[in-house]
C-alpha cells in the first residue's frame, strides 16, 4: 500500500469518498493537524440526511474532588424524528456504568429520539444513584426536544470512574446544547466525545444511494469484548431494526473486538447504529451495505488504536492456519498484549523471541494438545523470523526488522523517551506487520495493538488532573 500526500491530490469529493480504504488505514500522509482536520471536514464529516449534532462545554466542581475543578462537554446526536431503527451493543465488564444499564433498557423501547454523551465522568459505581441521575438528565433533555419522555434518550458517559455526574450543571446547560444543533457536519460531535484522544476520528462511505458516517472515541482502557469505547454510526438508509441489530453484532466481532491498547475493558463501552429512516432501502443490497459498515467500523478501530495512549507504533497481527476463530484471535491478542513485546516494538528492538513466547504462552495455556512448533511460520515486515521450529535471525534480518519498525513509527520520541505534545494527528497509516501461520487449520483473523511507552504511563498516572 502506497501512501499519498494529501496536498498532491485534487480535492475531488468523488475521488476521496469512493471508498473508506480503512483496511489499510488512511491512504494519505498528513503533514500537520490542520491538513488532517481539513481532510475530515471536506471529505468525511458530512452527516447523513435526517441527523443533527451539537456540543456545549461548561465548568463544574466534582463533589468527590472539590479541589479538582473540571470541564465537561456534552454532545447531542439527534435524528430528525424519533426512529425505531436503532441498534446498540455494550461492554461485558461486570461493573457496567449507569448509562450502560439504562442503554440496555432502551433497546426494548419502540423509538429513539436522541443520544446524549458527556465527558469527564463515566457515571460508574458512583454513590447516590447513578441510574437515577442519568434518567433525570434524559427526562430534562426530552422536554427540550419535545420527545415523549426520557425513555427516548440514550445516555452515554465517559471519564473518571466513581464520580457522580453533576446533574444540576448538566440540566442547566441543556438549552444551550439544543440551540447549537446543526445538520451539516459530524465533526463537532467527533471532537465533543474525546477525552484523552488527541484527535477526532471519523469514517464515512456513500453506499446504496445513502450514507454511513461513524465517529468514535477511545485511547486507553481498551480491549473490548462486545463493543468498544464509544462509537456512533449513523445512516439515512431505512434498514429494518432487527437487521440493523444483527449486522452490528456481526461487524463488531471482527472490528472493534479485535483490537487492544492496554487489555483493560472499559465499564462504559458502547457502539450504536442508528438510521434516520430517510432513504428507502432495497434488501437485495444488504451485502453491499454490510461491507460498507464493516469498512467504516474497521477504519474507526484502526483510528482508535493509532491514537492509543502514548502510541509510537501500531501492530497489525494477522493469524492464519488456526483450528478455530477463537484460537486465531487468542494468539493475536496474546501477541499484541505482551508487555515485553510491546516494549521491544517501542524501542525498535528486533527481540522477536518475545513474539514466539507470546504465541507459545497462549497455545500452551488453552490448546496444549495442539502441536504447532514445527508447523508454525512467523514473519515480521514480510521477513521470515521463525520456521521449522527455529528462529531465523542474522545481522541482515535484524537490520530489516529495525528498518521496518522505524518506518512505521508515528512519532520520534524526544530525548528521555517523553514527548510533551505527542502526535495530535495521524501522520500515516502504516503498521508493524506481523504474520503468524499456525499451520494446523484454515481459520484466520486480524488483531490490532500498540507498543508500550513512557507516555502511556505518564498519561495514566495523571489522568484525573
Curated annotation (Swiss-Prot):
Subcellular location: Mitochondrion matrix
Catalysed reactions, as listed in the record: N(2)-acetyl-L-ornithine + L-glutamate = N-acetyl-L-glutamate + L-ornithine; L-glutamate + acetyl-CoA = N-acetyl-L-glutamate + CoA + H(+)
UniProt: substrate binding residues: 195, 217, 228, 309, 460, 465
A GO BP entry: ornithine biosynthetic process
Primary site of residence: mitochondrion
GO cellular component: mitochondrial matrix
Active site residues according to the UniProt entry: 228
Record-linked InterPro entries: Arg_biosynth_ArgJ, ArgJ-like_dom_sf, ArgJ_beta_C
UniProt family annotation: Belongs to the ArgJ family.
Subunit structure as annotated in this protein's UniProt entry: Heterodimer of an alpha and a beta chain.
Comment field (misc): This protein may be expected to contain an N-terminal transit peptide but none has been predicted.
Protein name: Arginine biosynthesis bifunctional protein ArgJ, mitochondrial
Provenance organism: Phytophthora infestans (strain T30-4) (Potato late blight agent)
